[in-house]
Amino acid sequence: MWLGDYSLINLLGIFLQATFIQNILLSTFLGMCSYLACSSRLSTANGLGMSVALVLTITGSINWLIHHFVTGPHALSWLSPALANIDLSFLELITFIVVIAAFTQILELLLERFSRNLYLALGIFLPLIAVNCAILGGVLFGITRNYPFLPMVVFSLGSGCGWWLAIVLFATIREKLAYSDIPQHLQGMGISFITTGLIAMAFMGLTGIDISKPTAKSVVISDTSTNKSKTTSAQERLSSNHKA
């Protein structure tokens, strides 16, 4: 339930896959509004990316607990066997959004108290983290893949770091583009979308690499196939002896 068939090397694989191979922004284009609006300066993009990674990691963990102990199939069976058939799945989506909004509000208060400059730089886009589809999408992706708890935490962290990496890369390029001679009709959103597409194409080179599968399952499968082959060969030897 907490680690499942995943080993520590599998957790590293999940993190790398969520960050680079299946980058939540560059492969699914979730969270594009904040990505385009807050990437004109590297410092602002870095602060927003760090905030998104923090919110996604913590809310992903909390929402996993809610799914497995409250709203998921047979989730209430830990309270009483009589409650096992109660279905609260209709509350799941709104509950996830409430958790994300509540933690975003807490983060906003902390930034206002301890990092006033970053709070002012992010402006209206800080509370909009609550409705950033990348955060809700990351939570839903992890739950639909039936990750145990620790792999879910690592996947949420990797997805958040992937979003952070994408916006930092884009902000770095945009600062260079500010001094470039760009055709008039491509200035603004035009060159931004072209740049994002080129970054996404670079990450597409990693498509097809899967390093997040649990090794325990593959070991069990290989052991089972070995035992089957041994049984088959033994049966063949027995039948040949009978014929002789």
From Swiss-Prot:
GO molecular function, one term: oxidoreductase activity, acting on NAD(P)H, quinone or similar compound as acceptor
GO cellular component terms, A-Z: Gram-negative-bacterium-type cell wall; plasma membrane
InterPro entries: NqrDE/RnfAE, NqrDE/RnfAE_oxidrdctase, NqrE
GO biological process terms held by the UniProt record: respiratory electron transport chain; sodium ion transport
Alphabetic keyword roster: Cell inner membrane, Cell membrane, Ion transport, Membrane, NAD, Sodium, Sodium transport, Translocase, Transmembrane, Transmembrane helix, Transport, Ubiquinone
EC number: 7.2.1.1
Positions of transmembrane segments: 11-31, 47-67, 90-110, 123-143, 153-173, 189-209
Compartment list: Cell inner membrane
Entry keyword annotation includes Transmembrane: yes
Cross-referenced Pfam families: Rnf-Nqr
Role played: NQR complex catalyzes the reduction of ubiquinone-1 to ubiquinol by two successive reactions, coupled with the transport of Na(+) ions from the cytoplasm to the periplasm. NqrA to NqrE are probably involved in the second step, the conversion of ubisemiquinone to ubiquinol.
NCBIfam families: nqrE (TIGR01940), PRK01061.1 (NF002200)
Name the record gives this protein: Na(+)-translocating NADH-quinone reductase subunit E
